[in-house]
Protein backbone atom coordinates (compact mmCIF):
# COMPACT_ATOMS: atom_id res chain seq x y z
CA UNK A 1 0.00 0.00 0.00
CA UNK A 2 2.78 2.42 0.88
CA UNK A 3 4.41 1.86 -2.49
CA UNK A 4 1.09 2.75 -4.13
CA UNK A 5 0.56 5.90 -2.06
CA UNK A 6 4.01 7.33 -2.88
CA UNK A 7 3.60 7.41 -6.67
CA UNK A 8 0.06 8.80 -6.35
CA UNK A 9 1.37 11.61 -4.14
CA UNK A 10 4.26 12.32 -6.52
CA UNK A 11 1.89 12.39 -9.48
CA UNK A 12 -0.48 14.79 -7.69
CA UNK A 13 2.35 17.15 -6.77
CA UNK A 14 3.88 16.98 -10.24
CA UNK A 15 0.53 17.73 -11.88
CA UNK A 16 -0.13 20.68 -9.53
CA UNK A 17 3.37 22.10 -10.07
CA UNK A 18 3.55 21.22 -13.78
CA UNK A 19 6.74 19.21 -13.29
CA UNK A 20 7.89 15.93 -14.87
CA UNK A 21 8.28 12.69 -12.94
CA UNK A 22 11.33 10.46 -12.90
CA UNK A 23 10.45 6.90 -11.97
CA UNK A 24 13.22 5.33 -9.89
CA UNK A 25 12.81 1.55 -9.62
CA UNK A 26 12.72 0.51 -5.95
CA UNK A 27 15.10 -2.43 -6.32
CA UNK A 28 17.55 -0.35 -8.40
CA UNK A 29 17.61 2.30 -5.66
CA UNK A 30 18.29 -0.35 -3.02
CA UNK A 31 21.16 -1.75 -5.10
CA UNK A 32 22.57 1.78 -5.37
CA UNK A 33 23.23 1.64 -1.60
CA UNK A 34 26.27 -0.47 -2.54
CA UNK A 35 27.55 1.85 -5.28
CA UNK A 36 31.13 1.00 -6.11
CA UNK A 37 30.92 -2.60 -4.88
CA UNK A 38 33.21 -4.86 -6.92
CA UNK A 39 30.94 -7.90 -6.59
CA UNK A 40 27.57 -8.66 -8.12
CA UNK A 41 24.80 -7.04 -6.04
CA UNK A 42 21.46 -8.71 -5.32
CA UNK A 43 18.83 -6.72 -3.42
CA UNK A 44 16.22 -8.90 -1.73
CA UNK A 45 12.92 -7.46 -0.58
CA UNK A 46 10.52 -9.94 1.01
CA UNK A 47 7.51 -10.33 -1.29
CA UNK A 48 6.02 -13.09 0.89
CA UNK A 49 5.10 -16.59 -0.28
CA UNK A 50 8.81 -17.53 -0.75
CA UNK A 51 9.18 -14.75 -3.32
CA UNK A 52 11.46 -11.75 -3.43
CA UNK A 53 11.49 -8.45 -5.25
CA UNK A 54 14.98 -8.59 -6.63
CA UNK A 55 17.38 -7.94 -9.49
CA UNK A 56 21.09 -8.29 -10.25
CA UNK A 57 23.54 -5.41 -10.62
CA UNK A 58 27.22 -4.61 -11.00
CA UNK A 59 29.15 -1.37 -10.85
CA UNK A 60 31.85 -0.55 -13.37
CA UNK A 61 33.38 2.64 -14.73
CA UNK A 62 31.44 4.63 -12.14
CA UNK A 63 28.07 3.38 -13.35
CA UNK A 64 25.52 0.84 -12.22
CA UNK A 65 24.87 -1.92 -14.76
CA UNK A 66 21.59 -3.84 -14.59
CA UNK A 67 22.13 -7.54 -15.26
CA UNK A 68 18.58 -8.59 -14.31
CA UNK A 69 15.93 -5.83 -14.08
CA UNK A 70 13.81 -5.69 -10.95
CA UNK A 71 11.30 -8.52 -10.79
CA UNK A 72 9.24 -10.62 -8.40
CA UNK A 73 10.49 -14.22 -8.43
CA UNK A 74 10.80 -17.22 -6.17
CA UNK A 75 13.94 -17.29 -4.03
CA UNK A 76 14.82 -20.57 -5.75
CA UNK A 77 14.79 -18.86 -9.15
CA UNK A 78 17.08 -15.97 -8.21
CA UNK A 79 19.40 -18.39 -6.39
CA UNK A 80 19.64 -20.52 -9.55
CA UNK A 81 20.46 -17.42 -11.66
CA UNK A 82 23.20 -16.42 -9.24
CA UNK A 83 24.66 -19.93 -9.23
CA UNK A 84 24.60 -19.91 -13.06
CA UNK A 85 26.44 -16.58 -13.10
CA UNK A 86 29.30 -18.04 -11.06
CA UNK A 87 29.92 -14.57 -9.57
CA UNK A 88 30.51 -13.63 -5.95
CA UNK A 89 27.35 -11.85 -4.80
CA UNK A 90 26.50 -9.38 -2.06
CA UNK A 91 22.93 -9.48 -0.75
CA UNK A 92 21.11 -6.61 0.91
CA UNK A 93 17.57 -5.69 1.87
CA UNK A 94 14.86 -6.72 4.29
CA UNK A 95 14.70 -10.10 2.56
CA UNK A 96 18.17 -11.10 3.74
CA UNK A 97 17.12 -12.31 7.19
CA UNK A 98 14.05 -13.99 5.66
CA UNK A 99 16.02 -15.94 3.05
CA UNK A 100 19.46 -16.25 4.72
CA UNK A 101 19.08 -19.91 5.67
CA UNK A 102 17.88 -20.86 2.18
CA UNK A 103 20.78 -18.96 0.58
CA UNK A 104 23.35 -20.54 2.89
CA UNK A 105 22.09 -24.01 1.97
CA UNK A 106 21.71 -23.47 -1.79
CA UNK A 107 24.30 -20.99 -3.03
CA UNK A 108 27.26 -22.48 -4.87
CA UNK A 109 29.13 -19.19 -5.28
CA UNK A 110 30.93 -17.03 -2.72
CA UNK A 111 28.55 -14.54 -1.10
CA UNK A 112 28.27 -11.88 1.58
CA UNK A 113 25.38 -10.26 3.41
CA UNK A 114 25.71 -6.47 3.48
CA UNK A 115 25.86 -4.78 6.88
CA UNK A 116 22.47 -3.96 8.43
CA UNK A 117 22.81 -0.21 7.78
CA UNK A 118 22.75 -0.91 4.02
CA UNK A 119 19.48 -2.87 4.09
CA UNK A 120 17.02 0.04 4.00
CA UNK A 121 16.13 2.42 1.20
CA UNK A 122 18.11 5.64 1.38
CA UNK A 123 16.61 8.89 0.15
CA UNK A 124 20.06 9.98 -1.04
CA UNK A 125 20.38 6.92 -3.30
CA UNK A 126 16.89 7.48 -4.74
CA UNK A 127 17.75 11.15 -5.38
CA UNK A 128 21.12 10.46 -7.02
CA UNK A 129 19.71 7.68 -9.19
CA UNK A 130 16.76 9.93 -10.06
CA UNK A 131 19.18 12.65 -11.15
CA UNK A 132 21.06 10.19 -13.36
CA UNK A 133 17.82 8.98 -14.96
CA UNK A 134 16.68 12.59 -15.48
CA UNK A 135 19.93 13.47 -17.27
CA UNK A 136 19.43 10.36 -19.43
CA UNK A 137 16.10 11.82 -20.56
CA UNK A 138 13.96 9.36 -18.62
CA UNK A 139 11.60 11.95 -17.14
CA UNK A 140 7.96 11.67 -18.16
CA UNK A 141 4.91 13.88 -18.16
CA UNK A 142 3.10 13.55 -14.84
CA UNK A 143 -0.26 12.89 -16.53
CA UNK A 144 1.22 9.94 -18.45
CA UNK A 145 3.05 8.43 -15.45
CA UNK A 146 2.05 4.90 -14.46
CA UNK A 147 3.97 3.16 -11.67
CA UNK A 148 5.68 -0.12 -12.55
CA UNK A 149 4.24 -2.58 -10.04
CA UNK A 150 6.04 -5.91 -10.06
CA UNK A 151 2.90 -7.84 -9.20
CA UNK A 152 -0.78 -7.19 -8.62
CA UNK A 153 -2.00 -5.97 -5.24
CA UNK A 154 -3.83 -8.44 -3.03
CA UNK A 155 -7.15 -6.70 -3.81
CA UNK A 156 -6.47 -7.00 -7.57
CA UNK A 157 -5.54 -10.68 -7.22
CA UNK A 158 -8.71 -11.38 -5.21
CA UNK A 159 -10.86 -9.51 -7.76
CA UNK A 160 -9.35 -11.56 -10.60
CA UNK A 161 -9.92 -14.76 -8.64
CA UNK A 162 -13.59 -13.86 -8.04
CA UNK A 163 -14.04 -13.00 -11.71
CA UNK A 164 -12.45 -16.32 -12.70
CA UNK A 165 -14.70 -18.22 -10.26
CA UNK A 166 -17.75 -16.38 -11.60
CA UNK A 167 -16.98 -17.42 -15.19
CA UNK A 168 -16.71 -21.12 -14.32
Residue ranges of model-derived segments:
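Surface "functional belts" at beta-alpha junctions
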Residues: 20-120, 135, 149, 154, ...
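Oxyanion-binding "anion nests"
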Residues: 161
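Residue-level signal for inorganic ion chemistry
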Residues: 127
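Phosphate-handling substructures
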Residues: 145-147
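DPxDG-like acidic metal-binding loop motif
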Residues: 1-20
